[in-house]
Amino acid sequence: MLKLDLKRGSLLCFSGRFLSSNVYLMVVENRAVAVDGGMPWTANLVVDYLNKNRLKLEYIFLTHSHFDHVMGVNRLKKRTKPRVVAHTRSKRGDVKVKDEDVIRVIDNKLSFLVLYTGFHKVDHVWYYESNNQVLFIGDYLPTSTELKTLRERHGAKPKIILPGHGKPAFLQTLSY
């Protein structure tokens, strides 16, 4: 598990073994938001962490509906009944979002801009959390042109890019 301290709260990355996507947990005080659900064995790591630290999971944001990103969602939902956020083209989710929607959670301490990519999977989105300058990209890696467009169109300049698989990228020195 990787843990980073952020401007508002902390960010944890749970990496599962064999076929699982990363599951990210943003924690502010005793409340949490997950990005993707991973496979059940990765979700178990998240649930154990939530239980040990007495955290309430309020939302699960899905980047897309491939099995390795969603199979752990039911395990995550058992404990605190979080709301599941997904693109309108997804069959999953009870909060439907579209391109350029903004979802504010945990008393507005976290603010997620939804960016529809449509690449990789028809319901694929990125989530840009503006208070911490974090971009969750699922399985679609942005090009430098897309990062430039993101900055020009939305004033967003991510410092951390969090992929569905692999390690985070830190962009403090990248110019785009």
Regions found by a protein language model. Give the residues of each.
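Metallo-beta-lactamase
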Residues: 32, 40, 109-176
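Short catalytic-loop micro-motif centered on adjacent basic/acidic residues
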Residues: 33-36, 59-62, 114
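Short gly/ser/thr-rich secondary-structure transition/capping motifs
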Residues: 14-17, 93-96, 117-118
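A structural micro-motif
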Residues: 9, 55, 82-83, 110-112, ...
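Conserved beta-strand hairpin/beta-sheet module of binuclear metal-dependent hydrolase folds
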Residues: 1-49, 125-140
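Short hydrophobic patches on amphipathic alpha-helices
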Residues: 25, 50, 77, 153-154
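Active-site HxH/HxHxD metal-binding segment of metal-dependent hydrolases
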Residues: 40-107
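Short, conserved catalytic or adaptor-binding loops enriched in Gly and charged residues
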Residues: 2-7, 105-106, 154
